[in-house]
Amino acid sequence: MGKLRILGSGTSTGVPEIGCTCPVCTSTDPRDNRLRASSLLHTDDAVILIDCGPDFREQMLRASSFEKIDGVLVTHEHYDHVGGLDDLRPFGRFADIPIYSDAYTAAHLRARMPYCFVDKVYPGVPRIYLQEVEAGQVFHINRTEVLPLRVMHGRLPILGYRIGGRLGYITDMHLMPEESYEQLKGLDVLVTVSYTHLT
């Protein structure tokens, strides 16, 4: 599987949430401070970023990590998962970075960041490009196998990922089709976030 570093595991607003007076948000315990969801995976042959939210710059400064990113797996187009894509600029020094997402998310990214996805980009923009993927269709980042899985975030269909055959990564899950459960069998590690509580 390699090494997975959780860069952020907070809610869409981060923790603490501005204006919240609950015990967690007013806590002085540093463990109660969480940046928005993102992870960095090192496999045998690839460095893969999973989601790239608005805290990405701070996450990478904290991680002291500046290396080639071979691909970014995007789960969905919500700002807390893509708001940091512009901060990939310095990483373009190594190579152009593929952004893997479903067609729906790719369309939203093209509309939000048109300056990145045109034939002739001007200097200084992130060196990123979109690669559309489909749930259930395997692709590779270098030699690392990636299987996108269908997940439901409320009524919004999003992607989870099975990476390298041994790691599952699913965020903002409300429901998941039976076929996605089947595709997760045999994992060593499953990282999941569910925003609803059943009790």
Positions of PLM-derived features:
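Anionic-ligand binding region
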Residues: 173
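A short alpha/beta connector and helix-capping loop motif
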Residues: 178-194
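Conserved small/polar residues in nucleotide/adenosyl-binding loops
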Residues: 196-199
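Binuclear metal-dependent hydrolase catalytic cores
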Residues: 1-169, 178-182
